[in-house]
């Protein structure tokens, strides 16, 4: 609020941004839950022979689920937005930016295992300081001109740079062969589906939600075909096996 000359405008901008951040809380909650479960898991796996493969798989499925949450929130934003005051609907454009920033934050946390396992935790401080400089600098430079939208892009840039640097340095000290090709395909698919959803004008809300549900199913079908065969799910496997008999 101190970056804007008019206190009332500053308060309004802060209220709009804060309200719309609440919409992204689903992804934030998933990331937090993952954090609580992941650290005990990685330290329990430090003696396993296939530990690096397991870490890579955990990263891949984290991104897959996070992108699913992203699509779910964005596709049904017509309904979810009513969890906040209609006065703040003007700020809904920051929601996808915030959610992608949170995705990068979660990936950064996944990547952080390399400096924890190799006892180079000072790198965590370095990355955090770099992120701090980026987010403060971008807010100071752009908030006075662009308002709350600059806050969202500052967070996006901050977490993206931290994520990239952690991956880059981590490959030197503790190389893990993440399935970047597969992760990239899911990210591209999610962004393309989101782009289609927002670029196709459908005035009727029910028809719009129906169309976006089809797009969400496309993502799920791709997931099932490539990384989550139904016959690998215990209960469904029994049903499939019975039918085959």
Regions found by a protein language model. Give the residues of each.
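Membrane-interface helix termini and inter-helical loops of multi-pass transporters
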Residues: 1-7, 78-89, 201-203
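Membrane-interface helix-loop junctions in multi-pass transport and translocation proteins
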Residues: 7-10, 122, 129-164, 198-214
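Specific pore-lining/lateral-gate transmembrane helices of multi-pass inner-membrane transport
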Residues: 16-128
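Hydrophobic transmembrane alpha-helices of multi-pass small-molecule transporters
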Residues: 25-29, 70, 106, 132-139, ...
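Membrane-interface helix caps of multi-pass small-molecule transporters
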Residues: 41, 79, 114, 140-145, ...
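Membrane-interface helix-boundary motifs at transmembrane edges
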Residues: 48-49, 53, 118-120, 171-181, ...
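Alpha-helical transmembrane segments of multi-pass membrane transporters/permeases
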Residues: 95, 107, 111-137, 148-156, ...
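Membrane-proximal transmembrane or re-entrant/amphipathic helices at the cytosolic face
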Residues: 199-245
């Amino acid at each position: 609020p101190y970056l804007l000359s008019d206190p009332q405008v500053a308060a309004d901008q802060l209220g709009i941004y804060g309200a719309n951040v609440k919409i992204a809380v689903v992804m934030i909650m998933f990331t937090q839950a993952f954090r609580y479960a992941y650290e005990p898991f990685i330290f329990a796996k430090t003696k396993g022979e296939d530990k690096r493969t397991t870490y890579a798989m955990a990263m891949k499925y984290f991104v897959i689920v996070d992108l699913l949450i992203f699509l779910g929130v964005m596709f049904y934003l017509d309904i979810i937005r009513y969890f906040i005051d209609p006065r703040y609907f003007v700020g809904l454009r920051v929601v996808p930016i915030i959610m992608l920033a949170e995705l990068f934050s979660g990936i950064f946390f996944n990547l952080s295992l390399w400096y924890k396992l190799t006892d180079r935790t000072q790198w965590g401080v370095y990355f955090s300081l770099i992120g701090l400089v980026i987010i403060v600098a971008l807010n100071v430079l752009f908030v006075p001109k662009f308002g709350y939208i600059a806050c969202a892009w500052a967070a996006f840039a901050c977490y993206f740079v931290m994520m990239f640097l952690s991956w880059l340095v981590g490959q030197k000290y503790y190389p893990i062969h993440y399935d970047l090709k597969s992760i990239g395909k899911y990210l591209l698919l999610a962004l393309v589906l989101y782009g289609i959803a927002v670029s196709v004008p459908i005035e009727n809300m029910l028809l719009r939600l129906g169309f976006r549900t089809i797009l969400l199913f496309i993502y799920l079908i791709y997931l099932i075909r490539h990384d989550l065969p139904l016959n690998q799910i215990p209960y469904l496997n029994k049903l499939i096996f019975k039918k085959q008999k």
